[in-house]
Structure formats: C-alpha cells, structure tokens
C-alpha cells in the first residue's frame, strides 16, 4: 500500500499509515496550505479547505482582486518574509539588493521509496526502503531562483512523520540565509498546552506544562549546544491529555546546537509552530549552485496519551536513529573513578577499585578525567591526548592490560572539543582556539573551545585520538563537553560569514564523530556534556548512550529520568549509584533506593568501591546479579510512567517485556509524614488474560486485576524508600 496519495486535480497531498494522516494542499498563488495532522483517515474528499473571508489589514496576493484570500490568515506549511504574512517567517533570505522578499511558489513534487540520508547531518533512517516513503515538495522564488525543497518522510509502521528542508540556490548570485526552519505547522481551532523539558546543569529535563497565550513564545538554546537549559523537544497536548489518553503531538529536533521552537498564537486563535536552528547570530552565505540542508524534526502523533507518544520515540530513536552496533546489545555495568578520586589518582590507587569491581560482578572500569598531559586539576592539558607517565609509569597499556586480566572491559574519558592555555596544542596552534580578534576569550571551567568548523583542527584531534585508540585495547569512550560556546568567531571565515560559525561547529563535530565511529565501530561511545547538556537525538545517532546528568542524587534523578523518558529511550540514559550523602545535594538515601533509581536506566557506579561497608557491598553484588537478569527488560522493554514525582509524593514506573510475560515495577516514596494517605499502584501494559506471579511473595494475580484494581503501597515512615516488584506470567494451578 502506498503511504502517499496525491490528488492531482485538487493538488492535495495525503501522507497516511494505519495510525495517522498528514494532509496539505496547493492553494491560490502556489502557496501550500496545511489542512490536517492527526488520526488516520482513509480518504480526504476536499471539504476541509480553509474558508475564505475578507479580513481587514490582511492583504492579498499581488495582482489579485480576490480580497478573501490572504497568506496572513491561511494555515500554511512554510511561511516566508515579505509576502504580507505577518507571522514569524520560517525562512528569511537576504538578496544582493538588501531586500528579504521571498515568494515561494509550488513547482512540483517527487516521491521515492525509503528515506534518503541528509548531507552532513544525523537523521532517522530505514533499513529497508519498504519501511517508509519520502515526499519532496519543490517551491521556488521566481525572482531569485532560490529553491526550497520541503522533505517529508512517513514510516509505514510507526506514528512518525519526519520533516526537513533543503535550500538550493539556482540563481546567478549569492544570497544570505538569515533563518531556515526545518518545519512549520499551523493548527486551527485547537486549545493546546505545551510540554517542554527545561532545566539546568545537574537539574536537566524537568517537564513543564504550560498554556499558550496570544503572541510569540520561544523555547530554545543560544549556548551553541542543545543545552541543559532547554532540550530540543516540545509536545502539544490538549488540556485533557493524560499519560494514557488524549491527543499528543511530539516534535523532536535531531540537532546538537542552537535551536528554537517558536509558537505564535494569532488574532484568529490559530497556532503557528516552527522548529529548527535558532536564527540568533545565524547568517549563511549560499553561493550560486550551492545547497543548505536543515536538521530533521521527528514528529509523532498519538491519541493515546503521553506514554504512547514516548514509546513511539523510544522505538524510533533506539531502532532508527541510533546506528551503533551496540544499539540492540545489553550495555555493560561500569564503575567510573571520577567521584571516587577526582584528579588525585595513579595506577596503584586505581587497581584496588578494579579488583573490587571484579568481586562485585561489575563489567567495565572507566578511567575519567586526569589521565593525560600533566592534568592534576582542571587548569591544563586539554588538547594533549597522551598519557601522563607520572600516574602511569609503565604507560596506559600496562594498566589497560591489568583491567582486562581481571575480566573487565576498559573505558576512558575524553573531551576532544576543548583546549587549555597550558597545553602543547595551544603552544603549537594558538589559532585553533575560538576567540574574537583583539578580545580575551571567556574561560569556563578554566577551558576554551576548539574551532571544530575548521578541517585542520578536526584532523589534528582525529590524528591524536587515532593514535590513542589504535594502540590501546579501549572498549568504551566517554565523550565530554564541559562548557558552552562563547567568543564566536573563526579565523577561517571572512567577516561577512561569521554568522556561519555556530552551525559549522556542529557540522564539524558531526564530521569528526562520523570519522571516529566509522574507524572504530567496536568501541562503545557514551555522550556527555557536564551530564545531560547535550542529550539529544543528534548525538544519539553516533552514541547509543548518554550520561543523563552530573547529579547522581537518587531523589533528584527521579525527576530527571522521568522527564528524559518523555522523548528518549531508557537504553540511551546512563544512571549511576554514587555515595551518600550525595556530593551534589548532600542528601542521604539508602543503597537500595540509589540502586533502584540507577537500575531504571543503563546501570553504573560512580564511587570508591573500596570504601563501601560490607553490608553495602553485599547489596551491590546482589543488585548487579539482579540487574543482569532483568537488563534486557529494562533497556529494551516497553516503559510506562505510572506516577509523577512532580505532581505527587511518589514516583512509579514499570517495564514490560515485548511478549507481556514479564514486568518490573518500581515505586518510590519521597518524604514521609504522619498519618499518610493510603495509595495504590495500578499497572498498565499487561495481558489482561494472563496470570502473573509476584516473584518475591509467590502470590498470583490476573493481568486485568493488576491493571484495574492495582495494589496498595506499603505504609512506610521513612523518607526516600523504594519497593521493586517483579512479575512473571504463569499458568495458575
């Protein structure tokens, strides 16, 4: 069955699969009008065309006497500046005469099986061309001959449409792109609310639900990365939408740099949404014959609530964004030495941690910051990716060999995008540092940024890392970025092209990652940026897991991991057990609670194992054994949010196997108080016709019973307690 239907007579395009339809049409003057995005309809018969009304101060097409048609009031697929549309434009193009007028007129379309790659950018993909179909709509400005190709891909078996734009300069003169959104969509007669994922360093992705008022709202980042402060994701929901019912529209930008989600509610209560690269300090010179490709937006629609939206993203990102050979493999349990030692370590100090990890069943040791150059603190050596022989007198290979002899894999921390003043790299290539001529650059964590937009810089870093990786038996890389961009300038570009620096940095990063992951496909890469400061689908394309937050406090992590799950799969989010009291919050929590929260993602440990009490070591050893047993279920099962730590004094979630024959349920109590109310937990996602046994108590319940009646939570007079339930389907005697 074709996924794209074209009504040639009425010039209507209908993208459809079993769950959704996306419909738009070519209107008067060659303008694209958005008609519908929502649940599946078999056929569109043309009745839902926008009513034509003469509206004051909303002008008409040039040369037309029809006062009822206006681009200012028409719901559109892509708006531009200068055409008497007073909404925020999706695109702004500056011509050689200084004007920014752009009248994009429909020229034609192309349909192809599958999904083409995007040049230089990460994007969702297909493994077989029957999985999806792609529609390209060609729009051209007749005066400048600048062409906009609007790219739509619909998946056959996923509630997903992806969108991006390619701009082609078919004219004779260069133009400047001052804004190019990846997509636009206009809604009429909908009273939506937004769900966004704002945050801060060590406090990322706290879901916020808000109303939409008249005027313009922008959610985005100006930090050069996707940021801790505002994740590149937004959902539009009805005010009645819950976790398990109601319309939910998700928009997830596959990009790791400055981004913007712009909402405009207009005079007619129409909602106008644009998503793409933030136009702040963006100005791209597009020469004659050149093209520019925008990042991709992953759009999801469901009428079954937020959990269904999240599950669509979980499957899509895990299966068709992450490319690594590890995407379907169980991830190793690691111990990282950072919170155990910080910079104060040597080989002799690390070996006991490795020995203890072996005894506890941990599978990988990760050597964090401080192993290279002469780095005893954060003031030096970034850019010098050679081992510090003071700490490893016999070389790094000697220590790696020791780790492997204990039966553990070996991982290492890198921060390749940064440079220290006190480094050999800076002494040799001071021009590699990003700074504005005549001005002192701003430090952050005593470090500075390499200009990754330059090929020479990328080659230098690649060559250093290549030497490190090809001579060592390294199994894992933690790729960190501990500051945001500032002092935006590149000595490789002329003054009139400095507006390209932000985007060229991201493109350079992607090119470097492409080279490394291609050269070393058997190394597991984990992304990090001071925790979750670059937790986005663009990085997931190269790295199948990302450090969710530098905050390892179990209670804080409940909200962080809850919010992360809205748009990203569990297998992407790493979570570690650390010491108590926690080093970020000072909060005390039990080992069992810390373990359960960390086991709700890709489990690891971030502490000095040699300092654990005998009792805690037994808990860790037991928890490692248990996690290994349920690891496929946690990392690749269906995830359901049951109770929100934001709106209640509990958090609860569960993991269900694809066959619905096994489930793990975790219920977390927050603060204790006298005479607490009785609470129940109702499960979801089970087979109502099966019986399930509680593995701990041997009690048997029907699937329908667990979902309809649920069970009472224990009354516990203690803060931050956790109850974990393990159910398996059984045949009742």
UniProtKB/Swiss-Prot annotation:
CDD domains: GH36
E.C. no: 3.2.1.22
Catalytic activity, as annotated: Hydrolysis of terminal, non-reducing alpha-D-galactose residues in alpha-D-galactosides, including galactose oligosaccharides, galactomannans and galactolipids
PROSITE patterns: ALPHA_GALACTOSIDASE
UniProt-listed Gene3D superfamilies: Aldolase class I, alpha-galactosidase from lactobacil brevis, Golgi alpha-mannosidase II
The entry's keywords: Glycosidase, Hydrolase
Classification via Pfam families: Glyco_hydro_36C, Glyco_hydro_36N, Melibiase
Enzyme type, top EC level: hydrolase
MF annotations from Gene Ontology: alpha-galactosidase activity
InterPro entries linked: Aldolase_TIM, Alpga-gal_N_sf, Alpha-glycosidase_related, Glyco_hydro_27/36_CS, Glyco_hydro_36, Glyco_hydro_36_C, Glyco_hydro_36_N, Glyco_hydro_b
Single Gene Ontology BP annotation: carbohydrate catabolic process
Transport found in the keyword field: no
Active site as annotated: 480, 550
Primary role: Alpha-galactosidase associated with the raffinose operon.
Family the entry assigns: Belongs to the glycosyl hydrolase 36 family.
PANTHER family given in the database record: ALPHA-GALACTOSIDASE C-RELATED, GLYCOSIDASE FAMILY 31
Full protein name: Alpha-galactosidase 1
Protein's organism: Pediococcus pentosaceus
UniProt gene name: agaR
